[in-house]
């Protein structure tokens, strides 16, 4: 086979022939005007075919010069307005009174045959080996695509079979041999998009800037959720580029509906997954009508804000949708959404950022035709003014469906849009008054998604929970799953985000406490241990020790990153911890003469040692014109603000590309919280590295949390979906307590419905029920009250999931919520002042693993079903001696024992020989075996000698897989150090 056949010629010809067979025509070299970078033949052929009458009037004015004059007007128009805008506007001439369209788009035409006929007469032409220079030996582009004589797309092809890749040779060719100063390559004056592709991967850019040209991946994603493309039987993996994207209809849609110039002057071309998600949603609504639910699982780095904006634009143009509402709970995203919506649509007044009065929103909802961008906090005040209108249809786009966006107010938002009454909205407030902090309130409030016949929901999230999946997921043969997905793995491999787990260091804390005084009082054991842990972890010794570790690490090893701009974030477990760290860190920075500062982020006021602290007061050094700045402005505007201390703030919705380092001193006890928190590091920057130091969390658990959202399938199996009939069982179980009857419930509901909540009849009835309640044993009273509360949550959740509203069950949900408020005896336990009970006598924190990589893999995962049981927390009462014993067993002495184990086993000659001469897997197994034997010896020794503490320690250690792995790795590291030293 000839060498040229191995290169791109057959590849080029295959694409060329395909496009010619699907609506393109061949361009001719003789028709190309090098000076104006236009195909004159195709330009005027289009005008003759679509606007002949206007062209005749134009000819009558300019005679034989009409072509020259029109080209002048066209070039002037593009020069003033840019090509992208000009394609959607007129080329006008005052002297002749004419105006011409450069192209016809379906969305800009009526559905009459005349309009479609004009659309079909757009001329798409293609040139291969396109010589764009008028020289004897010009540079050539493999393929050039024109629309009505105007160059739109340039394509350079490479073949990996010839040792060339698009990502390397293709991008380099555009960077080095295509002069952006030439008209045809000038930004937004001629060519709009540049592709380079080989058989396996595709990349594009919209601006050539020599070596600064940035190409983005334009790939579908591989079978294993990574970068690249899947195998296509019998075809090139990149065939979608010419078979789908470059097809006439699709390319015109992209130009008209997706491409835009952003606020920074960049021309935006949708990434593949953005285009796919929007079009799939639009097509499904067209096929199945309004009323669907769509879970869009797009990772950080997916460009979610733009995807939401494009989707909102498509939905507001849907003939069956009156109003689009975009809801976000983050001010920064809220603002970005408003800006992006204006960018992608360009119509003033269509995208409305509602932050004024309730009447403003009410008017927009009633008028229809608007995209309303708002937060629930701004949306809520007027919800009860809007009555149901079944003839109006809505699209609700929820940003981060697991967050507080979907909270208690969301249920009321849906009540407004589905037309439920004021009374029902008030009842919802009662039912959901006591939701647990940090949970997905929308998913617990199911009422938010009820009666969706006139509402389509589009829920965007990077970290879907099982409740999110059940409410918004698409049903498949195996259960419910996402509608569209862009994985974390693909985002990382395509370099839109960084992997924040590449460099991870973990520590383990050890504490020993003693009691201060004799005390026989019994305390709630769990609360007492929590109070003690809070007390010891805010002690001066602990705070100063960790401050020393963190800041010495940052100063010695991290502060030079990003040319001295790197910032670090300290994740603290409470506001008090944040205040303590701020004071200690400022003292450390002053003592060591560091040339940078810290800031702190927390809410409210904290009192410490008789002094009151607020975020604003502690950040008083950062002033702008004498006025305190908000925390995000402080961080973004002050390069010397390099240590950011946070307590439940800035862990989501915070973008700072200079954030390279994270020090974690807080338990991250859920996959959503862990991924969101640590992923603050993943924003990209040139030459950026990341580092995590974790004092609290098990690295294996962090790995498991990230693996859930890294890639692979994520679904709720059919057998784990919530059984709606559980409501009947719950109802019967509640009635079996013989506290309230169905007749009682009906009477209570009728009195509430009649607005007679203060009537004597209701009071008497509730008093009778209260008497029955008090007759129960204490444990049964608590269980009964919790069943009442659980019933309401289950009812609204199940009603939302199954889109079935049972009026009888609704009445019970309302009544049971009222009874819960009346009957539930909230336990008031005095605060435990641990400082009066115990003192910290010994503390150390030991390095467990240093600068290792937490390996992630794409694994299919199935959600468990949601719990429908009521679980009352067991309350164990203990005296302080027992509490101290349990605390010390958990946190004390372990460092000495573990240190002895590491020292003894690392000195073992057989193990040293194994590490020196065996494979990694072999010596890891050998060390693990010896470690297990050593632990059994310790357990036996403690048991035989009656050393209960030692026996319990080794028992607990033998069951702690993560600790065993860390100890094994420490032994291996020490052996390697000893071998190296010898």
Name each region found by the language model.
Residues 680-708:
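Conserved segment of the helicase C-terminal RecA-like domain
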Residues 17, 21, 39, 45-51, ...:
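Catalytic cores and motor modules of nucleic-acid processing enzymes
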Residues 369-415, 422, 435-447, 625-633, ...:
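Conserved RecA-like ASCE ATPase "motif II neighborhood" in helicase/translocase motors
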Residues 406-500:
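Post-DEXD/H (motif II) to motif III coupling segment of the RecA-like Helicase ATP-binding lobe
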Residues 342-385:
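Inter-Walker segment of RecA-like/P-loop motor cores
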Residues 2-323, 332, 336-348, 377, ...:
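ATP-dependent helicase/translocase motor core
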Residues 232-238, 467-565, 582, 586:
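Interdomain helical connector at the RecA1-RecA2 junction of SF1/SF2 helicase-like NTPases
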Residues 533-646:
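Conserved C-terminal RecA-like helicase domain
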């Amino acid at each position: 086979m000839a060498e040229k056949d191995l290169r791109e010629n057959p590849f080029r010809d295959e694409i060329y022939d395909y496009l010619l067979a699907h609506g393109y025509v061949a361009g001719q070299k003789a028709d190309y005007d090098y000076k104006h970078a236009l195909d004159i033949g195709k330009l005027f052929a289009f005008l003759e075919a679509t606007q002949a009458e206007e062209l005749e009037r134009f000819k009558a004015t300019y005679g034989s010069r009409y072509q020259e004059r029109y080209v002048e007007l066209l070039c002037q128009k593009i020069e003033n307005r840019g090509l992208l805008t000009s394609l959607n506007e007129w080329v006008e001439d005052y002297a002749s009174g004419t105006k011409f369209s450069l192209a016809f788009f379906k969305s800009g035409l009526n559905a009459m045959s005349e309009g479609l006929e004009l659309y079909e007469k757009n001329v798409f032409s293609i040139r291969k080996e396109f010589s764009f220079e008028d020289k004897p030996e010009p540079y050539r582009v493999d393929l050039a695509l024109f629309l009505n004589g105007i160059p739109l797309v340039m394509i350079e092809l490479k073949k990996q079979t010839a040792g060339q890749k698009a990502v390397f040779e293709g991008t380099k060719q555009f960077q080095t041999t295509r002069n952006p100063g030439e008209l045809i390559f000038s930004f937004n004056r001629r060519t709009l998009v540049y592709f380079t592709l080989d058989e396996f991967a595709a990349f594009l850019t919209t601006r050539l800037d020599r070596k600064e040209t940035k190409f983005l991946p334009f790939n579908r994603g591989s079978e294993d959720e990574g970068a690249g493309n899947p195998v296509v039987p019998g075809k090139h993996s990149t065939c979608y580029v010419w078979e789908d994207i470059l097809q006439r209809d699709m390319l015109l849609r992209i130009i008209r509906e997706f491409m835009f110039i952003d606020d920074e002057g960049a021309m935006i071309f949708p990434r593949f997954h953005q285009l796919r998600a929007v079009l799939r949603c639009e097509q499904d609504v067209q096929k199945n009508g309004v009323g669907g639910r769509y879970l869009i699982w797009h990772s950080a780095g997916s460009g979610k804000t733009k995807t939401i904006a494009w989707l909102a634009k498509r939905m507001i143009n849907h003939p069956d949708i009156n109003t689009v509402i975009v809801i976000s709970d983050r001010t920064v995203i809220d603002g970005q959404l408003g800006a992006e919506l204006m960018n992608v649509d360009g119509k003033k007044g269509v995208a409305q950022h509602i932050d004024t009065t309730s009447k403003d929103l009410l008017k927009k909802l009633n008028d229809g035709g608007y995209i309303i961008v708002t937060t629930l906090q701004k949306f809520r005040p007027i919800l009860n003014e809007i009555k149901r209108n079944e003839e109006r249809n809505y699209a609700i786009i929820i940003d981060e469906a697991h967050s507080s966006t979907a909270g208690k107010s969301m249920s009321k938002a849906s009540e407004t849009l589905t037309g439920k009454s004021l009374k029902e909205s008030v009842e919802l407030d009662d039912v959901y008054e006591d939701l647990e902090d940090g949970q997905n309130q929308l998913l617990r409030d199911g009422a938010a998604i009820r009666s969706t016949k006139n509402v389509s929901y589009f829920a965007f999230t990077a970290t879907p929970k099982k409740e999110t999946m059940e409410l918004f997921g698409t049903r498949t043969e195996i259960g419910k799953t996402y509608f569209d997905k862009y994985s974390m793995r693909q985002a990382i491999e395509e370099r839109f985000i960084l992997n924040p787990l590449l460099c991870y260091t973990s520590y383990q804390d050890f504490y020993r406490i003693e009691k201060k005084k004799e005390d026989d009082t019994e305390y709630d054991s769990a609360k007492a241990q929590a109070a003690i842990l809070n007390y010891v972890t805010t002690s001066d010794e602990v705070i100063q020790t960790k401050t020393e570790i963190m800041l010495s690490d940052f100063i010695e090893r991290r502060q030079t990153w990003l040319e001295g701009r790197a910032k670090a974030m300290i994740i603290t477990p409470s506001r008090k911890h944040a205040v303590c760290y701020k004071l200690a860190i400022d003292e450390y920075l002053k003592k060591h003469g560091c040339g940078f500062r810290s800031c702190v982020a927390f809410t409210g006021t904290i009192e410490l040692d008789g002094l009151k602290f607020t975020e604003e007061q502690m950040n008083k050094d950062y002033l702008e014109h004498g006025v305190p700045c908000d925390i995000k402005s402080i961080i973004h505007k002050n390069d010397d603000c390099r240590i950011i201390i946070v307590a439940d703030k800035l862990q989501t919705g915070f973008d700072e590309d200079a954030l390279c380092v994270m020090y974690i001193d807080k338990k991250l006890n859920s996959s959503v919280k862990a991924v969101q928190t640590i992923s603050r590091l993943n924003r990209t920057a040139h030459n950026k590295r990341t580092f995590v130091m974790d004092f609290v969390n098990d690295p294996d658990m962090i790995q498991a949390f990230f693996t859930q959202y890294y890639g692979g399938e994520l679904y709720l199996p059919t057998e784990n979906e919530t059984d709606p009939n559980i409501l009947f069982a719950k109802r019967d179980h509640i009635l079996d307590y013989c506290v309230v009857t169905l007749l009682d419930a009906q009477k209570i509901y009728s009195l509430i419905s009649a607005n007679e909540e203060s009537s004597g009849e209701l009071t008497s009835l509730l008093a009778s029920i209260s008497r029955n309640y008090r007759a129960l044993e204490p444990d049964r009273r608590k269980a009964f009250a919790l069943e009442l509360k659980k019933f309401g949550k289950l009812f609204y959740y199940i009603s939302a999931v199954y889109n079935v509203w049972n009026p009888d069950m609704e009445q019970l949900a309302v009544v049971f919520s009222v009874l819960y408020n009346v009957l539930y005896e909230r336990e008031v336990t005095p605060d435990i002042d641990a400082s009066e009970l115990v003192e910290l006598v010994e503390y150390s924190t030991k390095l467990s693993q240093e600068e290792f990589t937490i390996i992630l893999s794409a694994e299919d995962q199935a959600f468990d079903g949601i719990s429908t049981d009521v679980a009352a927390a067991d309350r164990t009462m203990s005296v302080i001696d027992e509490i101290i014993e349990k605390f010390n067993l958990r946190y004390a002495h372990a460092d000495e024992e573990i240190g002895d184990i590491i020292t003894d086993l690392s000195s073992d000659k057989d193990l040293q020989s194994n590490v020196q001469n065996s494979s990694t897997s072999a010596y890891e197994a050998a060390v693990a075996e010896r470690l297990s034997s050593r632990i059994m010896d310790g357990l036996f020794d403690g048991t035989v000698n009656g050393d209960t503490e030692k026996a319990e320690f080794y028992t607990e250690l033998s069951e702690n897989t993560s600790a065993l792995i860390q100890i094994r790795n420490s032994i291996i590291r020490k052996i390697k150090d000893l071998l190296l030293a010898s």
